[in-house]
Amino acid sequence: MTKHLKRLVVGGFLVALAGVIVAQAPALTRTMVTKADVSVPGREAVVARVEVAPGGVAGWHTHPGDEISYVIDGEATLMIAGQAPRKVVAGEGFVIPAGVVHNAKNDGSVATKLVGVYVVEKGKPLASPASAPAP
C-alpha cells in the first residue's frame, strides 16, 4: 500500500470515527440538584437541571409523577400526547402530568436549559423511554 493510500484510509477512518462520536453525544442531559421526601407517602421530589443541545431531541418518554419545568435559557418545541406541539421559551413554564408521553426538540442555536421539578413515585426511574403517540 502506498504512503498516499495509507493516509487516505487513515483519514477516512478518523472522519468516520468523529461522526460516530458526535452521533453518540447525548441530546438531553439531566443533572440532579436535590432529592427529598414530600408529604405524600411513597413520593419524593427531584429537582434537576435539564439541557437539550441545539438541534437535539429529548426522545419520547414518561415520568412516574408530575413534571413542573421552567425554561431558563433557549427555546424548545414541546410535544405532549393529545396536544398540539407548542414552543416554550426562556421565562415560561409548563406542567406534564404523570405517565403522559412527551418529547422536546431544540430548534434553536443555543442549548435549551431548564429546571425540572418532578414529584414521583419513590424508587422508580425518573424517566422511561416510550413510543411516540399515534397522530
Region spans (language model):
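N-terminal signal peptide c-region/cleavage motif recognized by signal peptidases
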Residues: 18-22
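Short, conserved beta-strand element in jelly-roll/cupin
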Residues: 51-52, 63-78
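Ligand-binding loop in jelly-roll beta-barrel domains
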Residues: 77, 99-125
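Bacterial N-terminal signal peptides that target proteins for export
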Residues: 1-12
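A short glycine-rich, His/Asp/Glu-containing loop-to-beta-strand
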Residues: 26-60
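Extracytoplasmic
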Residues: 42-47, 63-66, 83, 99, ...
